[in-house]
C-alpha cells in the first residue's frame, strides 16, 4: 500500500505540468515588444503619464504636409528623452498603418516639471480611427479634422479663470470685431452672467468659446502628485498652440494676447491690412512681436451705464513696457510658447513708433456718470513719440460704441448685464496671490525661489458666486508599459457655486 503522501506529490506535479503547458500555449499569442522598448533605463519611471489636450488631422497643410496628424499634450519634460516618439496607428476604410511621431518641445524652459509638447506624423489618408501605442497595446485617441473656413485674423485669448472683468471683455469683443478679427477664448471658469453674454456673442460670430479643462490623471491621487501645480500658467503654451493648430489652414495671422491686451491698427483700416503690410515688407519672418505699453483706463462699474466709448477716450499711457506678444504667420510656424516659439524662427520686433499693444494694465472703476470726454486718446508710448495721429479715431470710436449699443439692447444680453459683478473680488484675490508666489520673485530676478507659476496655488474658495466651470469626460489608461495616456472628451461648461482655478 502506497503512503498517503505519494498521491499529494503526484497532484502537485500534474498541476505544474498543466500550468507549464498552458503558459507555453499562451506565449504563442502574446506579442513580445521590440528590444528598444525593453531599455531598463526607460522603465525606471515608466509608464510615463501623458495628458492629451487635442489632436488635429490635416488633409492638406502648407507647413506640416498632406495627411498629417498633430497631437498636443503635456507631460514630464523627461518624456522627451525617455520616450522620444509616439507610435501611432491610423485606420481608414481601406487600410491601416503604423507611423512614428517624434516628440517636439513647445515650452522653452524646464522651470516647471510638466511642459507642453507635440507629436507630428503623416498617417493614412482620411483616418476614421487614431490609436497610440502604450508599449504593449493601443489606446484610441479622439481627433478633429481642421476647418478651412476662412478667418483672416484670429485673436487667441489665454485661458481665463475666475474671469469677472467684464469691462475688458466687452471692449475686446467690439474692438476686435470692428477691425476684422475673430476672438477665440479658452475658459477654465467664469462668472455666470459673463458666459451667458458670451454665448450670444458667439452666436453673432464675434467669438468662439472653448472649455479649457484642468489635467486629471485617473490613475493618480492628486494628493500624491498634482500635475496642475506643475504646468506653467494653466498650460498657457498648450492653449496657444491649440489655437494655432486649430486655425492653421484657415487664417493668415494668429495673434496671442491676454484679455487686457488691445491691438489697435495704426497704419491700416484693419488687422489684415496692417499685418499683410508687415509680411510683405519682411517676407522671410515667421512671426511679429508687438511690445506692450501699459495704460490706465477709467470705466463705470455698473453695466447699465457702461460705455466702451468712455473707456477708449480715457486711455492714458504710463510710459512703462512689458514683455510683448506675438502674431504668428501660421503657414510658417507649428507651435509656440507664451511669448515666442521654441524653434529659432525669424521674427520681426515691431517698433513702438509703428504700433504696440495697448495694455489695459490699471482700471479705475467709477461709481457714477462723469462729464463726457470727447477727445481722441493719444498714442504716447514709452519711446516719447509725439504723434499727432491718435490711438484710435473718433470715427472708429463711434462705430464701436454703436455696435456695443446694438448688442447690449438685445434682450438675450440685457437681462444678464444687470447681474455682472460690481466688485472685482476674484481679481483682487488672484492679484495678491500672484504677487506673493510669482511677481515678487520675477521682478527681483530671484527665480530660484519661485515655484512653478500658475493659479492652482491660489485659494479663491471663500468667495461664492455662480460660475460656469469647464468639465469633460476623462479617460485614462492604466496598463501601459511605456506610457499611459489621459484625455477629456465632450468638454462643456457646468454651473458651480464658485469659480475654480
Curated annotation (Swiss-Prot):
<dbReference type="InterPro" id="IPR052012">
    <property type="entry name" value="GTase_92"/>
</dbReference>
<feature type="transmembrane region" description="Helical">
    <location>
        <begin position="10"/>
        <end position="30"/>
    </location>
</feature>
<keyword id="KW-0808">Transferase</keyword>
<dbReference type="InterPro" id="IPR008166">
    <property type="entry name" value="Glyco_transf_92"/>
</dbReference>
<keyword id="KW-0472">Membrane</keyword>
<feature type="domain" description="GT92">
    <location>
        <begin position="151"/>
        <end position="439"/>
    </location>
</feature>
<dbReference type="GO" id="GO:0016020">
    <property type="term" value="C:membrane"/>
</dbReference>
<dbReference type="GO" id="GO:0016757">
    <property type="term" value="F:glycosyltransferase activity"/>
</dbReference>
<protein>
    <recommendedName>
        <fullName>Glycosyltransferase family 92 protein F13G3.3</fullName>
        <ecNumber>2.4.1.-</ecNumber>
    </recommendedName>
</protein>
<comment type="similarity">
    <text>Belongs to the glycosyltransferase 92 family.</text>
</comment>
<keyword id="KW-0328">Glycosyltransferase</keyword>
<keyword id="KW-0812">Transmembrane</keyword>
<dbReference type="Pfam" id="PF01697">
    <property type="entry name" value="Glyco_transf_92"/>
</dbReference>
<keyword id="KW-1133">Transmembrane helix</keyword>
Amino acid at each position: 500500500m502506497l503512503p498517503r503522501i505519494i498521491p499529494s506529490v503526484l497532484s502537485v506535479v500534474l498541476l505544474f505540468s498543466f500550468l507549464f503547458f498552458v503558459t507555453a500555449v499562451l506565449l504563442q499569442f502574446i506579442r513580445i515588444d521590440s528590444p528598444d522598448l525593453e531599455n531598463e533605463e526607460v522603465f525606471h519611471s515608466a509608464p510615463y503619464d501623458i495628458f492629451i489636450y487635442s489632436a488635429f488631422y490635416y488633409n492638406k497643410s502648407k507647413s506640416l504636409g498632406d495627411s498629417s496628424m498633430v497631437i498636443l499634450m503635456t507631460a514630464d519634460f523627461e518624456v522627451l528623452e525617455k520616450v522620444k516618439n509616439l507610435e501611432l496607428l491610423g485606420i481608414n476604410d481601406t487600410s491601416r498603418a503604423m507611423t512614428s511621431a517624434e516628440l517636439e518641445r513647445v515650452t522653452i524652459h524646464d522651470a516647471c516639471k510638466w511642459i507642453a509638447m507635440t507629436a507630428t506624423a503623416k498617417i493614412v489618408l482620411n483616418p476614421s480611427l487614431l490609436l497610440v501605442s502604450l508599449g504593449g497595446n493601443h489606446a484610441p485617441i479622439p481627433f478633429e479634422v481642421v476647418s478651412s473656413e476662412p478667418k483672416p485674423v484670429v485673436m487667441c485669448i489665454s485661458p481665463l479663470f475666475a474671469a469677472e472683468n467684464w469691462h475688458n471683455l466687452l471692449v475686446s469683443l467690439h474692438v476686435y470685431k470692428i477691425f476684422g478679427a475673430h476672438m477665440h477664448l479658452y475658459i477654465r471658469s467664469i462668472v455666470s452672467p459673463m458666459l451667458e453674454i458670451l454665448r450670444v456673442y458667439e452666436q453673432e460670430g464675434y467669438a468662439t468659446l472653448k472649455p479649457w479643462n484642468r489635467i486629471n490623471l485617473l490613475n493618480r491621487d492628486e494628493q500624491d502628485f498634482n500635475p496642475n501645480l506643475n504646468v506653467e500658467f494653466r498650460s498657457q503654451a498648450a492653449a496657444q498652440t491649440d489655437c494655432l493648430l486649430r486655425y492653421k489652414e484657415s487664417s493668415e495671422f494668429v495673434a496671442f494676447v491676454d484679455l487686457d491686451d488691445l491691438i489697435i491698427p495704426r497704419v491700416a483700416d484693419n488687422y489684415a491690412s496692417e499685418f499683410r503690410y508687415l509680411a510683405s515688407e519682411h517676407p522671410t519672418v515667421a512671426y511679429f512681436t508687438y511690445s506692450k505699453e501699459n495704460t490706465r483706463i477709467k470705466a463705470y462699474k455698473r453695466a447699465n451705464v457702461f460705455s466702451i466709448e468712455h473707456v477708449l477716450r480715457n486711455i492714458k499711457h504710463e510710459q512703462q513696457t512689458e514683455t510683448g506678444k506675438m502674431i504668428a504667420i501660421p503657414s510658417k510656424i507649428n507651435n509656440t510658447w507664451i511669448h515666442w516659439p521654441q524653434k529659432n524662427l525669424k521674427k520681426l520686433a515691431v517698433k513702438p513708433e509703428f504700433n504696440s499693444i495697448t495694455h489695459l494694465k490699471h482700471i479705475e472703476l467709477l461709481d457714477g456718470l462723469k462729464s463726457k470726454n470727447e477727445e481722441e486718446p493719444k498714442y504716447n508710448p514709452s519711446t516719447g513719440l509725439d504723434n499727432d495721429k491718435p490711438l484710435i479715431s473718433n470715427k472708429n470710436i463711434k462705430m464701436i460704441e454703436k455696435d456695443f449699443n446694438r448688442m447690449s439692447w438685445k434682450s438675450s444680453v440685457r437681462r444678464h448685464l444687470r447681474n455682472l459683478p460690481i466688485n472685482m473680488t476674484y481679481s483682487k484675490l488672484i492679484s495678491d496671490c500672484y504677487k506673493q508666489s510669482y511677481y515678487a520673485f520675477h521682478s527681483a530676478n530671484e527665480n530660484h525661489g519661485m515655484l512653478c507659476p500658475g493659479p492652482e496655488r491660489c485659494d479663491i474658495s471663500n468667495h461664492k458666486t455662480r460660475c460656469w466651470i469647464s468639465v469633460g469626460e476623462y479617460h485614462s489608461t492604466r496598463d501601459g508599459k511605456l506610457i499611459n495616456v489621459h484625455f477629456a472628451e465632450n468638454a462643456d461648461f457646468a454651473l458651480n457655486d464658485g469659480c475654480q482655478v
